[in-house]
Each structure stands twice: as structure tokens, then as C-alpha cells.
Amino acid sequence: MKTIAENWPPVRGDYVTGKPDSRIAVVTLASHLEAFPNAAIWGSSKTENLGVEKIIVNVISNSNIRYVLVCGTESRGHLAGHSLLAIHANGIDEKGRIVGSQGAIPFIENISREAVDRFQRQVTLLDRIGLNDPEEIRKIVEDYRDKGEVYPEEPVVVCAPKKRQASFAVPSSGDVIISEELVMDSMAGIICLAESL
């Protein structure tokens, strides 16, 4: 069984990769701490929406990761760590809101409920919010890097929804006169020269 998605990790962010076959990933929240190479991936997360989404996408695309250490200083207002714990424990509601999150904007918009469910099943979160001691963090990474088995399903690659392409409207009428030379097509929202219509 393939355990790591091609081009892992699929989403860019403020992280470094270490041993892709390690069982532990490290999220340092708003702290920037020196990475230890025995973690699969190591980085910060300051927001309760896009930051949490990136963590989920990068974790579920590597079935080797079974633990996520949440450490470092919590980001004010956004509460990325609290939101990560909440989404793991409670999931999201029908509107994409992280159930139980106290973050400022706790909405997941770019990944599916299935991706969240997979994250909940695949990993155990190690809640050490506030821990900034490099030696203690290194010890946790060493304790968990080989612990347990690979998640028994292929990695999942989540594609972000396609952005709506901007369309260019051609004015068909000048129903609002701005001046002798300029008119506006109020349906298209375009101002153009009166002589061009």
C-alpha cells in the first residue's frame, strides 16, 4: 500500500519536512521553534481556518502520520490550537463551522467533511499548547516517531475547489448617461464611450 501521496506535502505553508515515514507531525502554533528532523513535518499555524485546513490536508496525504503534537504559544484571537483540538474532537457543522471553536473565524471552506473525518480517524492529537521547551518537544518527537502502525488506508489528496473565473462582460446598452461622452451599462457594470455602442 502506498503511504505517502506524490508531491507530499501538497499544500505550501510555514513548515519544514523531516522524515516522511515518521508517525508524528508538530504544529508550533504562533511560536517559531527549531525543527527536529525526526518529525514528518514541522511548522507553525496562526489561524483557525486556513491554518487548520493546511494541517489537515498535509496530514491526511501521509498515512504514516498518526500523531500531531500541538505545542507553542497560542495565537491571540484566532486560537488556532484550540480550533485544531475542537475540529478533531467535534468536526464541523453543516455550514463548515468548527464545532466548539472559540476562534474569531472558525469556518472551514476549502476541504470536505470527509477530509475532516479522515483526519479525526487517522491521528491522535497531543495537546501541549503553551509548551515551548525545545528539549521537552524533542523528547515527545523521539517517543512518538516510531509509535504505532501506518494508518491502514491510502493517503488522501484534497483538491481545493476551483476559483470562479472572472468573466468579461461586453456592454450592450448605455442605460445610464454619465456625460456626453460616457455611458454606463448598469447590468454589466461597465462604463464606456457612448460612440462605441
From Swiss-Prot:
Gene Ontology MF annotations: methyltransferase activity
Highest rank taxon of the organism: Archaea
Coiled coil segments of this chain: none
GO biological process: methylation
InterPro entries xrefs: MeTrfase_MtrA/MtxA (IPR030688)
Enzyme Commission designation: 2.1.1.-
Keywords from the UniProt entry: Methyltransferase, Transferase
Family: Belongs to the MtrA family.
Subunit structure, as described in the record: May be part of a complex composed of 3 subunits; MtxA, MtxH and MtxX.
Name of the protein: Putative methyltransferase Mtx subunit A
Gene name of the encoded protein: mtxA
